[in-house]
């Protein structure tokens, strides 16, 4: 409308093309530079979420596409957060974006991340905690349920991380090992000895925890890693 006030008629298509061209000329080189910088990080955090795109060629407007997010650790001076659009959730997206990277990647249990090679994968306790939380009774029964016990273990580990969050990575790792390892041993012992129907909420939570154990325990390797 501002252009119209000057007697210049511009279509939405023309203005959209301006934005696209400006992004290609000025923003894409900056994005590529940040991408290169990101791949030098010690730790990366990766996630993907659904989104919908209108008028995408050969796809319905209701089709799910994905926005991938990559960021470095909060311990570094220069924070970098990059988004990448993809019409699919295929693991090849992360594999291509992280090509050449050999550090730690924090991600959930999505098997597509197995496509990323030569990295140390770090699991997410929040996803394990969520599984147990789903089985907590809505009303108190006086005695803690097994899901509540699992939730308590997760909360204890998160409390430790909250206590040591202000420390530099090296000191944080020392405190983490001292405080968290006993809790982790008790937690995994409980996971292995607790019985539940595989189809129950508790059974699914225990199964998920067992599958994620090798990845979750990797947060004990570096103070820059998160739980």
Please describe what each predicted stretch is.
Residues 1-227:
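Catalytic center-proximal scaffold of phosphoryl-transfer enzymes
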